[in-house]
Amino acid sequence: MAESTLGARVAELRRRRGLSQKELGAAIRRSESWVSQVERDVLPVERLSVLQRLADVLGVAVRDLRPEAAEPMAADRGDGHRPGSAVFEQLRLLLTGHPALDQLFGDEADRESAVQLPELRARVDLAWQLAHESRLIEVGGSLLELIPDLEHAARAAAATQRPEVLTLLSRAYQVAATAFTRQEEVDAAWVAADRALSAAEESGDALSVVAGTYRMAQAFLRLQRLEQAEQAARVSVAALAAQAASEQPKPEVLSLYGSLQLMLAVIAATDGNRTAARTGLAAARTAADRLGEGRNDFDTEFGPTGVAVHAVAVAVELGDAGEALDTARTVDASVLSPERQARFLVDVARAHAQRRQATEALDALLNAERLTPELVHTDHRAREVVRDLLQFSGRRPAEELRELAGRAAVTP
């Protein structure tokens, strides 16, 4: 096939199959407008699951549509190396085997000792603060000592201290799952999320169990295991529904319930299910309105602003760039963490890129980079926008774009 772009390939293959844009869209659960934008190379197709559905309907292999998409996501960087990979390899090894085998031997009375809860609590809080600032290498480094200390403390603590230690251990594994997911080490993220669930259940804190399930759903989503991600989120939503609908629900319940509804909205948008995505956003917006303020229960950053930035992300996933940008103009994301602000700006950049507004897309990426350089240099969505902008610009990309591509190790 002579054409070099994805859009041209899709258009030619669609015509060969005798399909209209509307018919192709219906077959893959997307709109006619979405197909038109893809064929005109206005809208990039990033999701392997969507590429697979396109390929199935068009009767070709994914690599025939987009050869580079067949490569593993972790190979996104040209040299196969990710910043902080050595730290995360050590953290991955830490998750291998029993977390505190040495404490299973010896007299139980000898093992019991006083545990410094304030110090452990402060260290877990710091790990999450670093995560919210997208300083993932520092997160990984802190967890290399924190997780073993908490695992030992969970076995050494007095009965009165043990539930809180286990809750802290669950939070530590949750931040590990979050960091692994952002590093696209999703198999390790799943292991960390599973350990977070186990520690939370042992602590007796049901809401911590739900928070652990939320992290597991994030890992499934990144793996493109949409059915498993949806199942994990939906079961948790069902468990919280009665409490969330009560006259005076706990703020923590509303935060988790709303965050899970946002997760369902993103999952639906990723799968091209516009109706379900809108339903999830509406349910989350109702929970946020009842909450009345932005909070950070279980490190979810849930609140009205969080819902608004997710609405932008959902619109981008659905190919509704105009709606995404209209919504983005109404959002003051400064109340969110640097990580959330940067992800919001990446979504704004993606929306501009869908409309081939290269200058605006680059400005959004540079603003995101000023907040959290590590995120922009490693996040696959941000890097995809950089690559698209390089392709838009041809042989003479702007100096700022060339420099950003160099910092992120992105080639056309």
Kindly label every feature range from the protein language model:
Residues M1-R17:
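A short, Lys/Arg-rich alpha-helix, primarily the initiator
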Residues V10, Q21-G25, V35-V38, L65:
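Conserved hydrophobic/aromatic packing and binding residues within compact polymer-binding modules
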